[in-house]
Amino acid sequence: MKTLGEFIIEKQAEYPEAKGELSGILSSIRLAAKIIHREINRAGLSQDILGVAGSENIQGEAQMKLDVFANETMKKALLAREEVAGFASEEDDNFVAFENDRAKNAKYILMTDPLDGSSNIDVNVSVGTIFSIYKRVSPIGSPVTMEDFLQEGRKQVASGYVTYGSSTMLVYTTGNGVNGFTYDPSLGLFILSHPDMKIPTEGKYYSINEGQYVTFPMGVKKFIKYCQESDEATKRPYSSRYIGSLVSDFHRNLLKGGIYIYPTSTVYPKGKLRLLYEGNPMAFLAEQAGGMATDGFNPILDIKPSELHQRVPFFVGSTSMVKQADKFMQECAE
């Protein structure tokens, strides 16, 4: 039995030049995940943490009370260890520069969706936390700048998510494969339960909000029809599974094989998901697990961000399914 802490130390030992900063950040995330897990598990017992907070994020979306709690928990956990120089969140209008001396001398910045799928909390559906870590590009010792956050996804040094479901799992990559750790609340420890995770090349699930079908581009409509058609050679029809929480849908497809799609639409002409907080970290995980992630045409990780809360269409999952979806998108764009 190997704990997350032991695993982090073991991996750090493989890099003699490593000074432990990244390990410290992962430990901060581990602590934040435990605290968020505790609050989610008692959400049905306390009206103080259920429902709408009465505020909106920069995208104009109503913030749930647990959104605000998770955001502040992540921020405080990172600030306590002083291993990141700055922090950006889907819930904040702008990035936060940590101003104390040790934090300003840190090499890394972190971006997060602190509680993905939070609108599901009130009905006891799985939610998650997503995180993404980069090396800063601004001079060490100075406050972080916007350029530190507007980096292509290929420059990530680590990304991952925590899924709060029937069990709580932390899944992450540092660019050398994907590993999953299940939380044992009796011990207070994350235990390595899913080493070297690989997404099946061929999938059998497609995850998309079909209630928005009439608003989708023709390429997506054709792919949905393709998924629903019978064909023994490709084991179709595929099964439709859509939870409405990116982390939960991605996690199922990572284990079982499938594709998750949130495309452009007449309602969201640029897509709905955020490139920096959702697209890049999940795309990094997908590629490290042997899958693919695109915007329907090009790899997500190659997109150069132009703004902090940039939206992107998102196709992620088993390689064969993403390639097929992209093929329909490209044919309909010609």
From Swiss-Prot:
Its EC number is 3.1.3.11. One of its GO terms (biological process) is sucrose biosynthetic process. It catalyses: beta-D-fructose 1,6-bisphosphate + H2O = beta-D-fructose 6-phosphate + phosphate. Binds 2 magnesium ions per subunit. Belongs to the FBPase class 1 family. HAMAP family: FBPase_class1. This is Fructose-1,6-bisphosphatase class 1. The gene is fbp.
